[in-house]
């Protein structure tokens, strides 16, 4: 089994986490009217987000863009309505959670080509697919990321990437930033496109 870490020279790593897709989507459906337009200053189309844990439900950019001395991330009012989702994320092998967000591309929407953090060439966000309608596409460094509903993949967004939703349904992902503990990478998959979906409710 290949051993990964934050500095591994690779675009993404698929993880073997058991994702309670249906249970998370049930909670998402109770708060979907609270979505905010994501990064309206750029040339994206119908990209939305809401924060469950971070610096405010409408503070939907990456956590480091809001970080201030003496201010810690917190469970937002939206997170209070998605306690099962937050509890599941906290069960993952993280030493610290920095943010938890739903990122949604509406039908026929897209995220334009961009690089998140050019100076940080490392594997960072855990990007979990909850729905991935036919016609969806995630291209990272000119390679298509093997997403399907239930896939949990750590991405290196130092590379240029773009996302398309060429369907009539929402594309819904859950994104987590945080400090991974020593056991995190033990959950990496040997199979790049491995998918694990559980229909169980969240414990």
Regions found by a protein language model. Give the residues of each.
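Non-heme Fe(II)/2-oxoglutarate
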Residues: 1-92
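Extracellular carbohydrate recognition and processing domains
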Residues: 146-149, 153-158
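Short, conserved beta-strand element in jelly-roll/cupin
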Residues: 104, 119-135
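A short beta-strand-loop-beta hairpin characteristic of the jelly-roll/cupin
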Residues: 129-148
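A short hydrophobic beta-strand segment most commonly corresponding to one strand
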Residues: 124-130, 152-154, 169-186
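Conserved short histidine dyad/triad with adjacent acidic residue
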Residues: 101-120
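Catalytic phosphate/metal-binding cores of nucleic-acid and nucleotide-processing enzymes, i.e., regions
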Residues: 1, 7-10, 146-148, 182-199
């Amino acid at each position: 089994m290949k051993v990964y870490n934050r500095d591994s020279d690779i675009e993404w790593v698929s993880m073997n986490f058991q994702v309670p897709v249906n249970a998370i989507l049930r909670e998402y459906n109770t708060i979907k009217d609270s979505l905010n337009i994501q990064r309206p200053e750029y040339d994206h189309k119908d990209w939305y987000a809401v924060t469950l844990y971070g610096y405010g439900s409408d503070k939907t950019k990456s956590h480091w863009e809001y970080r201030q001395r003496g201010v810690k991330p917190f469970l937002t009012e939206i997170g209070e309505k998605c306690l099962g989702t937050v509890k599941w994320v906290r069960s993952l092998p993280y030493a610290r959670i920095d943010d938890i967000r739903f990122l949604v591309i509406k039908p026929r929407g897209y995220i334009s080509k961009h690089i998140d953090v050019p100076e940080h060439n490392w594997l960072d966000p855990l990007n979990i697919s909850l729905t991935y309608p036919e016609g969806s596409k995630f291209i990272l460094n000119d390679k298509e990321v093997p997403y399907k509903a239930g896939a949990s993949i750590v991405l290196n967004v130092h590379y240029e990437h773009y996302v398309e939703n060429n369907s009539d349904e929402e594309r819904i992902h859950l994104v987590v930033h945080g400090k991974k503990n020593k056991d995190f990478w033990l959950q990496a998959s040997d199979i790049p496109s491995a998918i694990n979906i559980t229909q169980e409710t969240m414990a």
